[in-house]
Regions:
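Non-catalytic, well-ordered alpha-helical scaffold segments
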Residues: 48-52, 67, 105-112, 141, ...
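Charge-rich, intrinsically disordered N-terminal extensions
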Residues: 2-58, 64-67, 71-74, 78
Length: 164
């Protein structure tokens, strides 16, 4: 049975709620036990971007398990996401489970696509600009679609039409 939950908040109440939640989430105590900690370990934009994408890819399930598995995954990348990706270190990854249904084969596939993006654009931010993600009414979905298209192009004819 599905119920629709409707909450009527004034603009002021909504602002208060969002400010309260932002303060809670942006605290060191919350960050220490949340996957958001992983991109914060890095200072270079590409390392932050790759760590954020990888952490978000496996961020489903128990937070403690997600953090443990993300820590292991970044260790597999020698804690140098961009260098590891550009150097194709992922080709030597042993077949193993990364997190739940995400395996080394999935990670290799993902990093191959990210390598393609970083070689062509230098950063995910520049890729997003080139793809005009900012014009989308749903930028997160548009970015995911653009990344998936890049992954698809690794294995199909050079026609982007095949990867729409």
């Amino acid at each position: 049975m599905s119920e629709n939950l409707s909450i009527d908040l004034s603009e002021s109440e909504l602002r208060d709620l969002l400010d309260t939640e932002a303060a809670r989430i942006n605290s060191p105590a919350f960050i220490a036990d949340d996957p958001v900690q992983f991109p914060r370990r890095f200072t270079s934009l590409p390392d932050v971007e790759i760590a954020a994408l990888l952490a978000s890819t496996i961020a489903w399930g128990n937070r403690r398990m997600i953090c443990r598995d993300c820590d292991r995954m970044l260790a597999l990348l020698d804690n140098q996401p961009l260098a590891y990706t550009l150097d194709q270190g992922y080709e030597d990854l042993p077949d193993c489970n990364i997190h739940r249904t995400f395996f080394a084969a999935n990670l290799r596939h993902y990093l191959r696509g990210l390598r393609r993006i970083y070689l062509r654009h230098g950063s995910l931010a520049d890729f997003a600009l080139a793809e005009k993600i900012h014009l989308s009414p749903a930028p997160a979905w548009a970015l995911a679609q653009a990344i998936n298209r890049e992954l698809c192009l690794l294995y199909t004819s050079p026609s982007p039409r095949d990867c729409s």
